[in-house]
Amino acid sequence: SEVNCLTYKEILVLGKNSPALRPTMYDFLVYRSIDILNTISRYNKQEPITNKQLLFAPVKEFVQMPIEVKKMDAYSNTLKLYQSLLQSEIAAERTDAILISDLDRLEYANNIIGLSQNDSLYIQSLEQLSQQYSKNPYKVEILYKLAQYYYQGNYISSNRDPQKALDICNNGIRQFPKYFRIDVLKQLAKEITQTTVSYSINPNVYPGHKQEVNLSFKNLSEISISLYKITESTLEYLNLNKRVPKLEKISTHTYRLPKRLDSQDTILRLPVPNTGRYQLTVSYANNSKADSSYFSSSRLSTIA
């Protein structure tokens, strides 16, 4: 298990971080086996996990716990592999490799149990590790898992907290700016703060009624929606190809929105005065090009 992975670099596909995070050939083989078991688990019913709390025990307790390996049971076999891997890393005193493998073990345990009441065990384990490695640059790996958890949340419980995730990222970036994988926190922080906008409109609106813009947005404080009437004849319009149609501006509405890091939904309504073909244009800060959609207004719009 002590054979350095670089000994086989000619036949392995090595990532930039492989020598640091997977330092021996044994590490590579264990993780390859875990990948195979994960594939098997998708196609075979797995035995339920009974001793859930021990799965989140500190690493020195986890490596001592008895794990009954069952034939064709991916869960027990994977946990046993993590246990064997951690035992070898503890024996070799590879502190950094122990942390990485332990983080993977905790995430795996949380995933296979998959119940919201176990989230506290997972978070508690990560926070304990964060304290243990408080001065070690590898703490960034722990912070990344914590930030991911709070950013992505759990579909069962309401534990999603993008602001907390962002704070964790920023604290890690300030504390360990030169860590070789600090970009994982920078990239996640960028994703959390990124402005996202999507919308849909009705293809037909009755004249005198309002077009409803179903808007989903994140990290956005203001949006402008402009309405234009296409003034060309039907024949001219159909033969436009890629040419921009002749437009008559009808209105522009600017809406103030609650700027938050989590996604929100709302409906914005614009009056449509007369029959005709319309272009609706959406613009907001930092959007390099306004987005346009088209719809029609006719007295037949409400007929199914």
PLM regions with names:
Residues 1-304:
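N-terminal, cleavable Sec-dependent signal peptides of secreted/periplasmic/extracellular proteins
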